[in-house]
């Protein structure tokens, strides 16, 4: 509730004509100074707002707030987004999900379910996926694989981690076509399966080295002689 009050206050200050008082940028207690107002005005007109919300009622409030101020918004979290999927589809607001968020971690996610992504897609909502914290980004394809296992269409899943994020956040199109940057990954099998690995990574048309700390450790500790000395030899 306090966050909504601050947001409403910030947007109200953009339209206020007062040169003094609470809304004035010259007031030491004003929420936004002139630079802050300029930044908020620019973001609200051309930027994208990401609201973290899981509870259905909070998602509805985001939709109402975005419509009131004509904002381009994205829902992040969305554990109960399936409950308000028709409203999300009508508003054209994308949802960023973790497909493994099927158990409530708080009262905000009591309605969490594994087929959340499938229900949203069926209703026409644009769905993206996240693995949560950044150090688990390598597990994103496994997260998406779980969404597919619970009804999310396979081709939509591949798009949800390639072309859809680029379209939502304004990146270059993630398509294979003449004239586009050659950013490709060649997999040993289905990229959404846990036993598949990247055979080759191509970035901007150049082959990326496939060595990493993990592959170097594998070479060092394999039982066969591979030319690398062991880090520690027991006496």
Show which residues each predicted segment covers:
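A general structural motif
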Residues: 32, 51-55, 77-79, 106-113
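Polyanionic/metal-chelating signatures
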Residues: 1-73, 197, 203, 229-235
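Histidine-anchored nucleotide/phosphate-binding helix
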Residues: 63-66, 79-83, 117
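Short internal beta-strands
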Residues: 74-79, 96
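C-terminal cap of metal-dependent C-N hydrolases
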Residues: 177-221
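Charged, amphipathic alpha-helical linkers/stalks
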Residues: 222-225, 230
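Active-site environment of divalent metal-dependent phosphoester hydrolases
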Residues: 56-60, 80-85, 136-138
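His/Asp/Glu-enriched, well-ordered alpha-helical/loop segment
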Residues: 48, 86-89, 94, 98-187, ...
